[in-house]
């Protein structure tokens, strides 16, 4: 269950909508009992710096590209 203490990790790229990573990673995270979620973030090349800086500010725990 997602709470105010839940952290996140993400897949970032363009495109990411086809990726099965969020399904697989979230199943593994839940199985392990970790308070993390894995999300996919669509990001255009020209927005990469802005997105990365924003993710730092909201304490993203890790990224896959």
Language-model regions: role of each:
Residues 1-65:
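N-terminal ligand-binding/catalytic initiation module
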